[in-house]
Amino acid sequence: MDFFPSEQARLQQFPVLQERLFLAHAGVCVLPNVAVEAMQEYLQRCALQQQEHEGVWRMVQQTRALSAAWLGAKASEIALLGPTSLGLSLVANGLDWRAGDEVIYHAQDYPANVYPWLNLQRQGVVLKALPTPRPGEITAELVEASLSQRTRLVALSSCHFLTGRRLPIDEIGRMLRARGVLFCLDAIQTLGAFPTSVEHVDFLSADSHKWLLGPMAAGVVYVREELQDQLRPSLLGAWNVCSPQFIAQSQIDFEPTARRYEPGVLNLVGIAGMRASMALLQEAGPAAISRQLLALGAHLRQGLEPLGFEFLLPGDDPLASGIVTMRQSSAMGPSMAKVGAHLRQRGIETSLRTSHQGGELLRFSPHYYNTLGEMQRVVDEIAAFCG
């Protein structure tokens, strides 16, 4: 799939390719050149003008609108905050909880989408872990069977960080909306890679430093318009409380949109980079990006499976993503740590992870700018090492 007019253009946009093959976007991504240039341009202007120089707020509004377009939301429903855990904590700490309220969560989720909810137990909130057969294997039927009359909110991730299985977001969200249960989504593992619609979602948080190809601590928080008066900001400052001419008032009146969750100065340099990366991905086409990620993952699986490795998610799973994670199925084969170290020596960067049972995992997460030829290089390197 041709996303670039030439190989030179691909290398210029992603200079990391001139040094190594980076396949760890599900961790912390490398930045495309457009993001670096946007951040440098902002910083260079800051040397000559104040940091809130002319054009900054236009850039912020454009980023808000672009984020809304990615999610199918309104710009008034978007706060520009990162990291992901900040947005999730704003939801957990902003609702008016009552003792006995229930929150359903996935105990084998990434920690950022576990601890904000566990912390609510201090207020008498009851936490119910989904009884999933395997990490990330969540269906609408499984969620519905866990609901009770006391269930207030369900907190899940759009894609599991280890298995790579995506969540059937619309199916679960539609069911929860019909039952009057709030739905909060950690979307960092799909936003920028796979369609992530908030049509049936109430709250969403995602930093840009993975599939959005943006910098760390620049992110997107979505709060459905109808719920903004219910979700009280837990962080207050001069920016999200109405303060005419920066004069403190005798009462607290919040900004009327999702800006009420932005208490102070924004991460403007990060937002500049995030906006540039989002525009780059928008130009490539979200649907085409998804197809490319599935093709890259399928090539890896097909080439590595004959070598005796076991994958956490079958290649024919309809909810597969750009994450491909494998483990050693033979006691005689090399450990994942050794395979990962060999690849690193050969200029290929992956992610060594640990399963919830303590076993070694090797995770591949290429992005749209990678090629099938590069995936074959990975297969060939591992085959030579294991042979």
Where are these regions (language model features)?
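Pyridoxal 5′-phosphate
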Residues: M1-G387
